[in-house]
């Protein structure tokens, strides 16, 4: 999310779709599909520190107006928890993300959505920027979609699937520039990812 915010002034179109699946073995598989405006993608090639939006190893489909970047990754639940804890003291953008084990079967996620009060918001994303309105207009219709899947979604303020195994968060990309106040302060979900018997997991 950090580089997404920092590079927003360069975006003519930015759609993001990310899927995270937490398995019974505590392995998280992630697939992220990002549609970048051609101008943004070309600018990224000149800013090595920002290329995490579409890294060299990403699967790319390039067109005259946009580039589709698909990345896949695997990590463990313990690694994700450690990363969130590290960010808490180092990164003002991601410091409010929470990944907490509830017990041996479930995990609780909290993703902050209070974009109005993000600490360290870049000056380019303020209404003082003469290009602000043009940037906001260019992002109309673009969305950030994040899905979490596990054995069962026990509770969430997101959209839970009919089979109860996944939950979806949809954020209009323009919310990062012009928060409407219609989003909750945070997205929360409690996911059950395995069944443990009397003898443990």
State where each predicted segment sits.
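Mature, soluble, non-transmembrane domains
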Residues: 61-201
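Post-signal peptide N-terminal segment of mature Sec-exported envelope proteins
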Residues: 22-42
